[in-house]
A protein has these predicted regions:
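Active-site-proximal specificity loops/subdomain of glycosyltransferases
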Residues: 1-5, 14
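Conserved catalytic core of nucleotide-sugar-dependent glycosyltransferases
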Residues: 10-112
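Charged phosphate-binding loop/patch that engages nucleotide di/tri-phosphates or the phosphate backbone
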Residues: 111-120
C-alpha cells in the first residue's frame, strides 16, 4: 500500500500516484512530489517549486518517522510536476496575522518569503 506524508494544503498528482502504483513500488520509495507552489490565492504561482508530499510505505514511515522524512525531503529522489501546494491562503490580512502570530518579523520578510512570483 501507498502511504502519503503530506500537509493538508499539498495535493498530489493523480497521474504520478497511478504511475508509482504501476511500477515496482518498493524499489522507488520514498519519493518526494515536487509541486507547483501558490501563495495567497491561485493567481500567485511561486517560480520555485515545493518539495511537499512524500510517497512511501508504512514500513519506511515506521522506521524513519514522518518528521524525519519531512526533514530529509530535499535529499530524497523526487518527481517533478507532481501536484500543487497552496500556502498562506486567505488574503494578505490573514497572511499578515499568521506571521504576527508566529512572531515573525514581517518588515522585509514578505519579499524574501514570497520570492519571485508570477501573477497568472
Amino acid at each position: 500500500d501507498i502511504l502519503i506524508v503530506s500537509d493538508v494544503d499539498e495535493i498530489p498528482s493523480k497521474k504520478k500516484l497511478e504511475f508509482i502504483k504501476s511500477c515496482d513500488f518498493n524499489e522507488i520509495v520514498p519519493i518526494v512530489f515536487e509541486q507547483h507552489l501558490f501563495h495567497i490565492d491561485c493567481n500567485f504561482l511561486r517560480l520555485e517549486s515545493w518539495r511537499g508530499s512524500i510517497v512511501t510505505t508504512m514500513e519506511i514511515c515506521k522506521a524513519y518517522s514522518p518528521h524525519r522524512l519531512r526533514r530529509s525531503r530535499n535529499r530524497i529522489s523526487h518527481f517533478s510536476d507532481s501536484g500543487w501546494a497552496f500556502s498562506s491562503f486567505g488574503g494578505a490580512e490573514a497572511v499578515k496575522k499568521k506571521f504576527e502570530a508566529c512572531k515573525i518579523e514581517t518588515k522585509g520578510y514578505w519579499r524574501d518569503y514570497f520570492g519571485p512570483i508570477i501573477n497568472k
